[in-house]
Design a protein with these regions (language model features):
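N-terminal cap/lid segment of alpha/beta-hydrolase-fold proteins
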Residues: 1-33
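Short, surface-exposed "cap/lid" segments of acyl-processing enzymes
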Residues: 33-76
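Glycine-rich "HGGG/HGxG" loop immediately N-terminal to the catalytic nucleophile
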Residues: 51, 79-95, 268-269
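Alpha/beta-hydrolase active-site loop
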Residues: 94-115
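Alpha/beta-hydrolase fold nucleophile elbow
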Residues: 115-127
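Alpha/beta-hydrolase
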Residues: 157-244
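Conserved loop-alpha-helix segment in the C-terminal half of the alpha/beta-hydrolase fold
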Residues: 236-267
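Catalytic histidine-centered segment of alpha/beta-hydrolase-like enzymes
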Residues: 266-277
């Protein structure tokens, strides 16, 4: 796998004061020197960064990017605006979900444009990234299919905490840490080694309050989900955010094909589960079936 880090200037798309950059890593299969046929555009969740898809603190068996490049697919992983190494606009209150989605869409556009030809794009978002991939697909329809992992349009289950408690802990504006201790039971199954959990938590990112507030707002992307007109895959683990996974596909009423996959023996962070390869295989098969 060949990996290239980049800082993508999305100033014009974001429309904020000062320059605005999205940090990204492009993972390509070994030996790929030309335009890829298939690209996965991957957005991490709240409190995370793009290393979720290729964690430097774990062996390669935990690398989503490594596994998918071995299948011949390119992976573009970004840090969401305001998170990881991407710009942290000030005041944070100048951000909105629409601005963040526009910045992400521009980052994807720039990378695809460099190849000078058509590329089949799968947009994929995990958790809060699922919310953002829905928003992006609705407002900037440049993806051929959308995979929503661990995001619930139903009222969310949040481990040992709840929506009301997290809402009460939000500050008016700024960048905040995700309370990880109450999330452990939601994020990790019993088979995930403690050392891996602690390393994952040590690499956490802060999150813009704007995104945290949106993610805790019931129905925040219901209208956007209903407007997506490409194939959609909904993925929930047996321990995850939706109280009724079977109801999740119904929110994507304009999609020509909606599929639900349940990841067995896994919690919310599927990439750390012992069943992760089965999950990746099912996801890869769906991409190929809908290409």
């Amino acid at each position: 796998m060949k990996s290239s880090d980049m800082m993508l200037d999305v100033t014009s798309a974001a429309g904020l004061t000062g320059q605005t950059f999205i940090a990204a890593t492009l993972h390509l299969p070994d030996g790929m020197d030309e335009r890829p046929a298939q690209l996965i555009f991957a957005i991490h969740g709240g409190g995370y960064s793009r290393i979720y898809w290729h964690p430097p603190f774990a062996d390669d068996s935990y690398s989503f990017a490594r596994w998918f490049t071995d299948q011949g697919k390119a992976v573009l992983a970004i840090d969401m605006l305001g998170m990881g190494e991407s710009s942290r606009p000030e005041p944070e209150s100048s951000l909105s979900g629409a601005i963040i989605a526009a910045a992400h869409a521009e980052a994807l556009r720039q990378v695809v444009a460099q190849w000078g030809g058509p590329v089949d794009v799968t947009g994929l978002g995990h958790s809060m990234g699922g919310m953002m991939i829905i928003a992006q697909a609705a407002s900037h329809p440049a993806m051929d299919r959308v995979a929503v992992l661990g995001w619930a349009n139903e009222p969310m289950i949040l481990g040992d905490t709840d929506v009301a408690s997290l809402q009460a802990g939000l500050i008016p504006s700024g960048y905040i840490a995700t309370p990880r201790a109450p999330m452990r039971r939601l994020f990790y199954g019993d088979d995930v080694p403690l050392a891996l959990i602690e390393a994952d938590e040590a690499h956490a990112s802060t999150t813009p309050v704007t995104m945290g507030r949106d993610a805790l707002t019931p129905g925040i992307v219901h209208q956007a989900a209903a407007s997506i007109a490409v194939p959609v895959l909904v993925v929930q683990s047996v321990i995850d955010t939706s109280p009724a996974p079977e109801k999740e596909p119904g929110y994507f009423s304009a999609s020509p094909a909606v599929e639900l996959q349940i990841v067995e023996a896994a919690a919310h962070c599927q990439n750390f589960a012992g069943t992760r390869v089965k999950h990746w295989t099912q996801l890869n098969d769906w991409i190929d079936r809908t290409s």
